[in-house]
C-alpha cells in the first residue's frame, strides 16, 4: 500500500481509489498488504465493505505500519490470528534485529473457507530494506514462530510478502532463476538468502503455475515504468494447485496504485 509519505499524484488519498479499483476488478478473495497504517487502511476498507482485516502495527504500541491481511468476509471465517516481530524477541512489540532499518512483523491468520470447509494458514510479512542479515534472520524467525509448526501439523499454508530480496543477483534475476539450482545448491544458498530459504519450505507459486506467468517478471516500480526488480512473492504448500500467477501492471489513467505492482495467484486447495 506504501506508507502515507508521498506527494502529488502519488499521495495516499489519491491512490486509495486506484487500489480499491484494482481489488474490485480482480476480485481478490484474500490478500496481504505492506506499509499500511491504520487510518489509511480504514479508508481503503470503507471502500471495500465486504472485506475484513487482521493485524497490528509494528511500533511498540502496535501502531505504525502494518502487514494487514484483508479477506472477503462472505467467503472466509477467521478462526485465529496474531502478529509477531521479526527479532530475537518476537513477542516484544517494536523489537528489531541490530542493523535493521525498522521493526518488522509477520501477521498470520487461520481461515476456514465457508464454501468448502477447508482450512488454511496465511502468513504475510515485509522483510527489512536495509540489512541483508536482518532479512535472513527475519525469515528464520518467521519459520521458527509459526511456519514450521504449521507445516509439521500438515496445514495448508500460504506466505506472501515484500521480501526486499531476489534469489539471483538483482541484475541477473529472471524467471529461470529458481530452476538454476539443484536441491542441494538451494539448501546451501538458504543459509545466505531468504528467498532460497523460503523456497526450501514452500513452493514459489510463480515457478509452479500451470499456466505461464502473466505480466512483468519485476514487481517494484517506485512509481516508474518499467518495473525494476522482483521482490514480492506468493508461496504455498505442495497440496495447493496453482492455476495462474500474475503481476498486475494496471495503471489508472496513467497513474500508479502503489510503488509495487501486486502479485496474484489463482489456486485450488487439493
Question: Which stretches of residues belong to each language-model region?
Answer:
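Active-site metal-binding loops of divalent metal-dependent hydrolases
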Residues: 1, 125-127, 162-163, 261
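N-terminal, active-site-proximal structural segment of metallo-dependent hydrolase catalytic domains
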Residues: 1-47, 58-65, 269-270
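Acidic/histidine-rich helix-loop elements
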Residues: 1-17, 86-101, 131, 180-183
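Alpha-helical scaffold elements lining the catalytic groove of polysaccharide deacetylases
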Residues: 10, 133-147, 224
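Stable alpha-helical elements in mature extracytoplasmic
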Residues: 15, 19, 40, 44, ...
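Structured beta-strand-rich core segments of catalytic domains in phosphoester-bond hydrolases
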Residues: 30-123, 127
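Catalytic metal-binding/acid-base residues of hydrolase active sites
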Residues: 37, 126-128, 163-166, 209-211
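Metal-dependent phosphoester-hydrolase catalytic domains
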Residues: 133, 148-158, 165-270
Amino acid at each position: 500500500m506504501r506508507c502515507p509519505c508521498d506527494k502529488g499524484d502519488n499521495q495516499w488519498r489519491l491512490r486509495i481509489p486506484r487500489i480499491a479499483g484494482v481489488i474490485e476488478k480482480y476480485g481478490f478473495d484474500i490478500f496481504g498488504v505492506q506499509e499500511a497504517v491504520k487510518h489509511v487502511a480504514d479508508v481503503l476498507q470503507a471502500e471495500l465493505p465486504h472485506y475484513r482485516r487482521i493485524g497490528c502495527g509494528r511500533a511498540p504500541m502496535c501502531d505504525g505500519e502494518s502487514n494487514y491481511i484483508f479477506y472477503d468476509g462472505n467467503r472466509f471465517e477467521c478462526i485465529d490470528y496474531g502478529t509477531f516481530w521479526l527479532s530475537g524477541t518476537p513477542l516484544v512489540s517494536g523489537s528489531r534485529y541490530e542493523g535493521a532499518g525498522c521493526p518488522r512483523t509477520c501477521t498470520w491468520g487461520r481461515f476456514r473457507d465457508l464454501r468448502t470447509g477447508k482450512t488454511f494458514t496465511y502468513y504475510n510479512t515485509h522483510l527489512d530494506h536495509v540489512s541483508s542479515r536482518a532479512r535472513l534472520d527475519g525469515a528464520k524467525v518467521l519459520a521458527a514462530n509459526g511456519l514450521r509448526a504449521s507445516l509439521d501439523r500438515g496445514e495448508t499454508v500460504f506466505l506472501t510478502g515484500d521480501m526486499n530480496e531476489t534469489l539471483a543477483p538483482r541484475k541477473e534475476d529472471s524467471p529461470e532463476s529458481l530452476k538454476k539450482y539443484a536441491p542441494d545448491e538451494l539448501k546451501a544458498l538458504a543459509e545466505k538468502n531468504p528467498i532460497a530459504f523460503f523456497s526450501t519450505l514452500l513452493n514459489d507459486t510463480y515457478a509452479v503455475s500451470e499456466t505461464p506467468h502473466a505480466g512483468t517478471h519485476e514487481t517494484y516500480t517506485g512509481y516508474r515504468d518499467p518495473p525494476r526488480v522482483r521482490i514480492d512473492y506468493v508461496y504455498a504448500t505442495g497440496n495447493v494447485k496453482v492455476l495462474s500467477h500474475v503481476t498486475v501492471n494496471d495503471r489508472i489513467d496513467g497513474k500508479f496504485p502503489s510503488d509495487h505492482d501486486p502479485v496474484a495467484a489463482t489456486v485450488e486447495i487439493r
